[in-house]
């Protein structure tokens, strides 16, 4: 027998940055997660404890997935068609960075994590040049 609750419960759960949209965007969110991936890889490599190393892999994979999430939100919600005029490679830059986050998720390669950080820095420069700190942060980006 169907209950009233089962009729009105969501058929799937969806996560989003907020999709109000609140208008708060910053590549720093992706960078913090990518830095975590790099540090976790370093800690993993320095440890002989198999249980700790397994935890490192699990948490690093979660952090790398969050990098992808934060990049996707920034790419799809902040950047607009007019930004393509200044940055015709914008889509390719984000696509490659998201693919790089997948590489970090799949491996324990510190070099891959460093490359991801470099890609996020490039995205950060695009964000800054398009007015990101002033347009999307309450009082600009904290220094």
Segments from the language model and where they lie:
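Short, solvent-exposed, charged loop/turn and helix-capping segments
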Residues: 70-87
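Short, Lys/Arg-enriched phosphate-binding patches
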Residues: 51, 58, 75
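Long, contiguous binding/interaction regions
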Residues: 66, 77, 95
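N-terminal intrinsically disordered, cationic/polar leader segments
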Residues: 1-53, 83, 88-122, 126-143
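Alpha-helical segments in soluble extracytoplasmic regions
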Residues: 55-71
